[in-house]
From Swiss-Prot:
Enzyme class: hydrolase
Species classification: Bacteria, Pseudomonadati, Pseudomonadota, Alphaproteobacteria, Hyphomicrobiales
GO cellular component, one term: plasma membrane
Entry function: Catalyzes the dephosphorylation of undecaprenyl diphosphate (UPP). Confers resistance to bacitracin.
Record's subcellular location: Cell inner membrane
Name used for this protein in its record: Undecaprenyl-diphosphatase
Organism per entry: Chelativorans sp. (strain BNC1)
Amino acid sequence: MAEQTIAQALMLGVLEGFTEFIPVSSTGHILLAGHFLGFQSTGKAFEILIQLGAILAVLSVYAGRLWKMLIELPHEPATRRFVLGILIAFLPAAIIGVVAYQIIKTVLFETPLLICTMLILGGIVLLWVDRWAKKPLYRDITQFPLSVYLKIGLFQCLSMIPGTSRSGSTIVGALLLGVDKRAAAEFSFFLAMPTMAGAFAYDLYKNYHLLTAADLQIIGVGFIAAFVAAVLVVRSLLDFVSRRGYALFGWWRIFIGVLGLIGVLVLG
């Protein structure tokens, strides 16, 4: 395995971990990095399996709370209602993701210009919502009305357009619906668990034939890097957005989108 390839795997794993749970589009960053670095040979298999590192990261950080919810589920109505809310929010993306899988993966994911455009547009929207979102009505993620869970789930469907961001679409939707900034990020974590796990399982089912023993080393490096980076982000993001909001992420999206556009137009 070439040293340069290991270095690329490490970089892309860190990139996946750091960007998966913040509203900047991990897919957009990974695809643009792969496009400009020429990291195409293990593309799909690598991208699928490093996502597992990010999934396990959020599960490990919230393991105690998830275990408590599991114990309470049979006899605690509030816990059952919260789990129902997560399921309601998850279903729209699950249904559309399966129905439109081929279009999403073969058409939209092959368009760097679209990715850059969505990074920029999403950055502008995030800046606007961060500045002008209405006064928070909901601060406890377990107490949203069921209609709010559904609407956040519908917003999440926008993330199927590469460059939009899964966490970004859910956070923007939550803020527009009156959810507190911290709670918006926290609910995005919980919604990520079934959404990312489902996407990972379906992607793996569709592409398992691409996995080879030769890829294991590079995938292992990317997986570990993604896990460590994602743990750091999940542990720190809630306090960060409570103090600073989301403006920094909006400006970052615009910067990367413009940089990507220049690269696409100049380098192709």
